[in-house]
C-alpha cells in the first residue's frame, strides 16, 4: 500500500508496555477501524494515505494484542485474512437468487437488436430492423455500461454488515463455499462501512491485475513451481485452493457489479445508483462505467473501451449493457436462463487454440536466432495468425512445445502473437521435439550461445545476408536515418543481388539501377534516391542509433551524443569512459567498445562520412545530475505547439522518465486538448496536471534547456 503522503494519524503511536483489558479492547477497536479505513482508501478510492511500513506496523500491533487477549479476536478482524487450516473439500452452496449467465453479442447488429427488444418490451416505439437512433431523447432506453472482467464470478453474503459467506457461481443454482479463501482477499471488506442492510448479497468478479500476475509467475518460476497461463487461470486456481494459506499469498482483487438477495432496505432505483451504494459501503467498484441512452450510446462505449483495452491494468473480454432502471429490468424479466435486460458484447478473442505445424528459426539484425512456430491459421485478436514467436530454445523447453502440438496462442493489441501454453492431452503420437540448429540456416556460420544468455546467435556478422537485411532496415527506419521508401522487399532484392552489402552502399545507388528492380519504376526510383540524398544531413544521436549497436536504443544514443559531442570521441572511448555516460552500465559499455573496436565497423562509418553523411557536432557535456531525474511524467492529448514525441524528448533530456500510463507513482501528467482517461485517472489520484506552458515552466525552473539535435 504505497503512498506519497500520510493521512491524519490520531492515536497512531503504539502504547508502551502491556495494556489492561479495557484499554486493550479500545485499542483493538481503534486499530481495526484504522486498518479498515486504510484498506478502503487503497482498494476502493485508490488513494492510500500511509506507506506500507506504517500499515504493517498497525497490523502487527493488532496481531500482538489479539494474541495477548484472545477473547478480543473476532471473525471480521483484518488479522483473520491470513488463512487457517487446509480444507478436505468445498461445501456446496445453493444461491438464494440464481447467478445467471448473460446472452452474448458479437456484432453491431446484435446490439441494435438488443436495444430494439428492450424498447419493445418496455412499450416504446422501436426503430425498424437495421435502423437506430430513431428514438427521441425521452423514448431512448437508458443503459448502464460496464466492463466484462475475465475472472471468476463470486457471490458475497453480508449479514448486518459482516461477511458471512462467499460462493462461486457454479452452475448458477449451486456453487462452492469458498468463504475461508475469500476472507484472505484484502480488496474484499470483512465488514461494510456505514449503515449496512440486514442482508446484502453482492455479485462480482475475483480477478488478478496483470502486474500482480507477472510478479506471481516470477515467484513461481524462482521457486521451481508451475507458472500460470493467464491471470484468469491464476485467479481461479488461487481461489479454489484447499489450503487458504496459499490463497492468502496470491494477489487477488475484486470488483462488485451486481445484487443478489437484499433485506432491510429498499432496492435502489437504478443499477448505477446500486454501484454507487456499493462503493459507499466500502466495496471496490470499477470506475470505467457509464450511463448512456440508446444503441448508439452502447456502441460508442464499446468502441471507447475497445481502444483502451490493452492499456487497462486487467484483462477484460467485452463490455456489459444493462437496462439501468431496476423496475424496467423486472418488467423485461428473463428468457431461459438469461436476463432480457442485459447483454454481454464480446471483443474478438485474444486467446485461441491451434496446431504447431512446424518450428523454424529466424535470424535478427544482431544475429539473434529466434524460433518461430508456424501455425495452422487461426483468427485471434481480430486478425488471422499464422506465426507466433517462441523467443528462444529455453522457452521452448520450459513450455514443452513440440511440432504437432495443440497450443494456446495469444495476441493482444499490437503485441506479437505468442504461444502461451501447450494442451498436452491433445499431443499426437507423432509429435516431434524441436532441435536447435548448430549452423545458421541463412549463411551456414556457427551458432553459439553464451553461458549467461538465453539467446543463441549466428556468428556470421555482416557475412550473413539475414543480418545484413535487418541491419539495413534498421539503418533506414524513420527514427534512424529516415530513408522513406526503403522497405523489406526492396532490401531483400538489393542484398540478394549483391548490390548492397553495407549501409554505405545505399549512397552509391542510382535511378537506373533501382528502376531495373522488381516493382520499381523511374519515378519510385527517383523518389528513393532523393530520400537517400536527404538523409545525408542527420543528427549525431540518429546516426549512432542507425548503426545498430547492440543494447543501444534511442535514449542511449541521445545520452552518448550529448555526453561526447563528437563521434570520434565516442569511437575512441574505452569502457571506463563509457561508464561515465548517464544510464550506461557494464554490459552496454562493453557492447559499444566492442563495436568500435571492430575494423569493419569503423570502415563502414568512414565510408558513410565520405558519402556525405554529416551532422552538427558540439562540445561534450560533462555528466551532471539531471534536474528531473527520478520524476515520472505521462503525456496525454494534443499539445498546442509541439508533438508528444517532442515533449518526451525535452523531458527525457532533463532526466525524467516518460511512462505510458498513470499510476500512484506518476509525478506529473502533461495534458493537451482532447485528453482522455489518463487525465481522469490523474485527477482521481491527485496527480498534478500541467499544460504545455506549465511543463516548459517546470523545465525552465529546473534549468533544463531543450535538447539540441
From Swiss-Prot:
Top-level class of the enzyme under EC nomenclature: ligase
Keyword terms: DNA damage, DNA repair, DNA replication, Ligase, Magnesium, Manganese, Metal-binding, NAD, Zinc
Chain positions covered by the region annotation Disordered: 1-20
Gene Ontology annotations of biological process type: DNA repair; DNA replication
Gene source species: Cupriavidus necator (strain ATCC 17699 / DSM 428 / KCTC 22496 / NCIMB 10442 / H16 / Stanier 337) (Ralstonia eutropha)
UniProt name for this protein: DNA ligase
Keyword Manganese: yes
Disulfide bond annotation, renumbered to this chain: none
